[in-house]
Amino acid sequence: MTVDAVRVELGARAYEVRIGPGLIARAGAEIAPLLRRPKVAILTDETVAGLHLDPFRQALAEAGIASSALALPAGEATKGWPQFARAVEWLLEEKVERRDVVVALGGGVIGDLAGFAAAVLRRGVRFVQVPTTLLAQVDSSVGGKTGINTAQGKNLVGAFHQPSLVLADIGVLETLPPRDFRAGYGEVVKYGLLGDADFYEWLEEAGPRLAADTEARQRAVRRSVEMKAEIVARDETEEGDRALLNLGHTFCHALEKATGYSDRLLHGEGVAIGCALAFELSQRLGLCAQEAPSRLRAHLRAMGMKVDLRDIPGDLPSAEALLALMAQDKKVVDGKLRFILARGIGQAFVADDVPGDVVRTLLEDALAQR
C-alpha cells in the first residue's frame, strides 16, 4: 500500500500528515530532513513504550539519529500539571534546544501534553506527532491544539502549536485494544456527521470491518484528516468553522469531568454519546427529522459503541449539575453555551442561542433511562 500525504495549508507553518503502514519503521528517514542536529527527545507513555518505542528508536538509529525517551503513565490522568511539569523539566535536563525537535509517540494524551511542552519550552520548539491510536490519528494529532486538563475542566490550559510533521502509521492500530479502537471511531464518524454525508454512508457499510481491513482503515483515516486539514486551514484558532469539529464535545467534556477522566468513559466514547445527544437536541429543536438521530444511534450500536447515558457505568450527576459543568466549557461565549447542531447528517452548524431548558429536559430524559 502507498503512503497518503495530506497537507495542512498554513503558509510558512504548513506541514504534511503522512498516512500508511510501516511509517514507524521508516521514521528516521521521515524525520531526518527536519533536524539541524541528529538528536531527538521522545515523550511517550508506558503502554506505548512497551509496544513501539524500541522499533521507533531503532528506525531513528538506522538514520544516524540519537534519541532519549521519557515514558509517562498511560491514561487521561497524566494530562495534568504534575506530569506536564515532569515532562518539561526532563526536556530541560536533556538540554533540548530551540532548534531541536520533540517527538510525541502515543495517543491523544501524549500528543496534547508533549505538544504543549514543546510550545512553552524555550518559548517554542518544533515537534513531530507520531499518533498510535485511531483517535489521535484522525483528530488530536492534526491542527495544533495542545494542552492539559485542570481541576476546572478539560483542555482549559494550552496553546495552539502546530507540529512540523505527523506520521500516522495505520499498522500500529492493529495493536489497539478493541475498546480503544471503537473509541477512536467516535471521532471518525463525527467527520461524516458534521460535513460529509457520503463518507458517513460509506462508514455505515465499512465501519464494522475497519479494524481488520487495512485498506478501509487507511481510507477512513485519510478522509478524516482531509476534512480536519481543510477546516484548520480556514480557521486555525477556532474563530468560526473550526468549532464544527467540536460536534458532540460540549456534552462529552461535561461527561468526562463527571466521570473523573477515568476508564468509565474514554474520550471517543464521550464524543459518540455527545454526537447522539447533539442530534437528539437538533431534532427536539425542529432542525432535523427523527430519522437522523435514530440512524446515528443504530450505526453506533452496530459498531458496539456506547450510545446513551445509560451505557456509562456508575453514578452520574443530575441534569442541573451536568449543565453547570457545560458552563465551564472553553467554547462558552459571553456566558452562553455553544452547541454544534445539525439540520441532517453532514449538515452541522454552530449555535449559541440554544435554550437551556431544552438541554436540561434532554439530559433529564436521558438520565431517566438509566
Curated annotation (Swiss-Prot):
Domain of life: Bacteria
Cellular compartments per GO CC: cytoplasm
Residues the record lists as binding NAD(+): 108-112, 132-133, 145, 154
Entry EC no(s): 4.2.3.4
Location in or out of the cell: Cytoplasm
UniProt cofactor note: Binds 1 divalent metal cation per subunit. Can use either Co(2+) or Zn(2+).
Cofactor(s) the protein requires to work: Co(2+); Zn(2+); NAD(+)
One Gene Ontology term of the molecular function aspect: metal ion binding
Pathway: Metabolic intermediate biosynthesis; chorismate biosynthesis; chorismate from D-erythrose 4-phosphate and phosphoenolpyruvate: step 2/7
Primary enzyme class: lyase
Catalysed reaction equations from the record: 7-phospho-2-dehydro-3-deoxy-D-arabino-heptonate = 3-dehydroquinate + phosphate
Residues noted as binding Zn(2+) in the record, renumbered to the chain: 187, 249, 267
Gene3D superfamilies, alphabetized: 3.40.50.1970, Dehydroquinate synthase-like - alpha domain
Biological process terms in GO annotation: amino acid biosynthetic process; aromatic amino acid family biosynthetic process; chorismate biosynthetic process
Entry keyword Zinc: yes
InterPro entries: Dehydroquinate_synthase, DHQ_synth_AroB, DHQ_synth_fam, DHQS/DOIS_N, DHQS_C
Keywords in alphabetical order: Amino-acid biosynthesis, Aromatic amino acid biosynthesis, Cobalt, Cytoplasm, Lyase, Metal-binding, NAD, Nucleotide-binding, Zinc
Family to which the UniProt record says this protein belongs: Belongs to the sugar phosphate cyclases superfamily. Dehydroquinate synthase family.
Its job: Catalyzes the conversion of 3-deoxy-D-arabino-heptulosonate 7-phosphate (DAHP) to dehydroquinate (DHQ).
UniProt-listed NCBIfam families: aroB
Protein name: 3-dehydroquinate synthase
Organism: Cereibacter sphaeroides (strain ATCC 17029 / ATH 2.4.9) (Rhodobacter sphaeroides)
Name of encoding gene: aroB
